[in-house]
């Protein structure tokens, strides 16, 4: 018989918020009796944008901005119905994107 697994991917711009959310999820799953592996840090995406500072000319004067997307992966093996109910009722902070695969 195949084991049932829930895979949760978290994405956020702030690493502190994503780590707090991951700890809440892991703590909730362990309290309900499921096996948890993670949080596993995935590679951080870095997007760099270059913008000309001046409005009309002075192309040599530029400014660069970057946006980092932090990601974490959590696997919950053999979840119980109690685990699923606890995860559905969990309040996580805004700014965290959650993808759940069964």
UniProtKB/Swiss-Prot annotation:
One of its GO terms (cellular component) is ribonucleoprotein complex. InterPro entries: Ribosomal_uS10, Ribosomal_uS10_CS, Ribosomal_uS10_dom, Ribosomal_uS10_dom_sf. GO terms for molecular function: structural constituent of ribosome; tRNA binding. Keywords: Ribonucleoprotein, Ribosomal protein. Disulfide bonds: none annotated. It holds the Pfam family Ribosomal_S10. The keyword Glycoprotein does not apply. The keyword Ribonucleoprotein applies. GO terms for biological process: translation. HAMAP family: Ribosomal_uS10. Involved in the binding of tRNA to the ribosomes. Part of the 30S ribosomal subunit. NCBIfam families: PRK00596.1, rpsJ_bact. Belongs to the universal ribosomal protein uS10 family. This is Small ribosomal subunit protein uS10. It comes from Staphylococcus aureus (strain JH9).
């Amino acid at each position: 018989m195949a084991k049932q697994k829930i895979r949760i991917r978290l994405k956020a711009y702030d690493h502190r918020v994503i780590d707090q959310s991951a700890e809440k999820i892991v703590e909730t799953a362990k309290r309900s009796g499921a096996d948890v592996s993670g949080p596993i840090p995935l590679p951080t995406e870095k997007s760099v944008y270059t913008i000309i500072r001046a409005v009309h000319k002075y192309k040599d004067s530029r400014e660069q901005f970057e946006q980092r997307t932090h990601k974490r992966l959590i696997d919950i093996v053999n979840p119980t119905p109690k685990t699923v109910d606890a995860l559905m009722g969990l309040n996580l902070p805004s700014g965290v994107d959650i993808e759940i695969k069964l």
